[in-house]
């Protein structure tokens, strides 16, 4: 496996309270460092990540770089940032990347190292391109560039930290038993998260990106690519989640329109090393 990046100085902690007792925001948690029982404030970027960074979760975090703002201020601030979550199941540890920005960094590293089979030897690329067409498209996409054949491409990256034996609602999951299932037979799914109504789309922004890529593809010769970065290895397939029918239908339409799908699997170690596993995890739709 090829190495993509390393997060240095990781320490393990257990989330004690979230939101923090001291800073009332869901992005800050009170975390106890496992090695010395010290209680610290940790920044968690992903609103609990559906249990992966909630109370009781074991996480891996790194010190937040010191700046003039947080060293000269008397105000409380986060000393650590949470990057990874540790799942313990059937005497096995699975390390899951939950910091959203990691997905873009991992994708860029894979792009530079020619590991993405659909985007080898690109001539040029850049991060964060805004595309605007009045009444049609108005979004910032993660990558754009020129491929090895001289064709322009746009690529949007989505972080996929979640997986389960079946992609079903929490209510249905309580009725099922997965004790006899292979631990590595889970389905990775996107999107998932909080919403006020079950009929709402989970991520309006993600839906907008997908629909706009479909539109751009239909209107031009630009290659439009969705890259789903699956930051765990206990999976054997990916699918647009059944809990968001609107996104699921948009995904199907995007594929029909010619939008290319990359499903990149990443393996993390407790030392903070990230490795490229594959970019063609089977898709179920």
Label each PLM-derived region with a short phrase.
Residues 21-30:
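Short aromatic-glycine-enriched beta-strand elements
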Residues 223, 233-285:
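N-terminal targeting/trafficking signals and adjacent low-complexity tails
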Residues 6-21:
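Structural detector for short beta-strands of small beta-barrel domains
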Residues 19-22, 62-71:
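Short, charged beta-turn/beta-strand-edge "cap" motif at the junction between a beta-strand
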Residues 47-61:
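Short nucleic-acid-contacting surface segments enriched for D/E, G, S/T with interspersed K/R
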Residues 69-94, 98, 279:
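OB-fold/S1-family single-stranded nucleic acid-binding modules
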Residues 176-245, 265-267:
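Nucleic-acid nuclease catalytic cores
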Residues 19-21, 88-101, 117-177, 202-211, ...:
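Active-site metal-binding core of divalent-cation-utilizing nuclease and nuclease-like domains
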């Amino acid at each position: 496996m090829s190495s993509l990046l390393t997060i240095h100085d990781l320490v393990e902690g257990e989330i004690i309270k979230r939101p923090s007792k001291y800073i009332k925001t869901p992005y800050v948690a009170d975390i106890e460092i496992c090695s010395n029982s010290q209680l610290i404030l940790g920044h968690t970027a992903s609103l609990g990540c559906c249990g992966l960074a909630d109370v009781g979760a074991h996480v891996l975090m790194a010190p937040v770089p010191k700046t003039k703002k947080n060293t000269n201020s008397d105000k409380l601030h986060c000393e650590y940032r949470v990057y990874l979550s540790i799942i313990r199941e059937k005497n096995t540890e699975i390390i899951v990347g939950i910091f959203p920005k990691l997905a873009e960094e991992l994708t860029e590293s894979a792009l530079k190292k020619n590991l993405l089979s659909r985007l080898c030897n690109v001539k040029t690329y850049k991060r964060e391109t805004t595309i605007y067409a009045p009444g049609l498209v108005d979004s910032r996409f993660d990558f754009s560039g020129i491929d090895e054949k001289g064709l322009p491409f746009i690529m949007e990256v989505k972080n996929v930290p979640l997986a389960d034996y079946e992609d079903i609602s929490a209510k249905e999951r309580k009725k099922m038993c997965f004790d006899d299932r292979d631990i590595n037979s889970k389905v990775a799914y996107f999107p998932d998260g909080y919403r006020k109504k079950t009929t709402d789309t989970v991520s309006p922004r993600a839906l907008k990106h997908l629909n706009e890529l479909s539109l751009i593809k239909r209107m031009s010769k630009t290659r439009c690519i969705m890259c789903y970065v699956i930051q765990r290895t206990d999976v054997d397939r990916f699918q647009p989640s059944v809990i968001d029918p609107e996104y699921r239908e948009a995904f199907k339409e995007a594929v029909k329109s010619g939008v290319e799908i990359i499903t990149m699997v990443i393996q993390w170690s407790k030392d903070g090393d990230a490795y490229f596993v594959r970019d063609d995890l089977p898709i179920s739709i």
